[in-house]
Curated annotation (Swiss-Prot):
Gene: atpC
Purpose of the protein: Produces ATP from ADP in the presence of a proton gradient across the membrane.
Family in the record: Belongs to the ATPase epsilon chain family.
GO molecular function: ATP binding; proton-transporting ATP synthase activity, rotational mechanism
Membrane topology per record: Peripheral membrane protein
Descriptive protein name: ATP synthase epsilon chain
Species in which this protein is naturally found: Thermotoga maritima (strain ATCC 43589 / DSM 3109 / JCM 10099 / NBRC 100826 / MSB8)
Length: 108
């Protein structure tokens, strides 16, 4: 399956992958190829992606995940390897995600 992670600053990850795991606002989950379609809200979390013998770990500042059964797309304010992310920019993105989450929860 193709996994793509997109931020306002560009595409952070775009590769064929065998497995992806992450944390949603409801708990942790993973996706294998040919999974049933899903749209979910991500928590601030570490995304683990397996591609063959390689394993990638990327931090995401919340966002949304869409899986159509063939491809997985993550849309987030900030993402990258921990050592590459500006802590200030990551915290600002996290705060924006939390404000949006609180707004939508109060609207329900």
């Amino acid at each position: 399956m193709k996994v793509k992670i997109v931020t306002p600053y560009g595409i952070v990850y775009d590769r064929e992958s065998d497995f992806i795991s992450f944390r949603t606002v409801e708990g942790s989950m993973g996706i294998l190829p040919r999974r049933a379609p899903i749209v979910t809200q991500l928590s601030v979390c570490d995304v683990k992606i397996k591609s063959g013998d390689d394993e990638y770990h990327l931090k995401v500042a919340g966002g949304f995940l869409l899986c159509d059964g063939k491809d997985v797309i993550i849309i987030t304010e900030e993402a990258g390897r921990e050592e590459d992310i500006s802590p200030d920019r990551f915290m600002e993105a996290r705060e924006r995600v939390e404000r949006v989450r609180r707004f939508f929860q109060s609207s329900l």
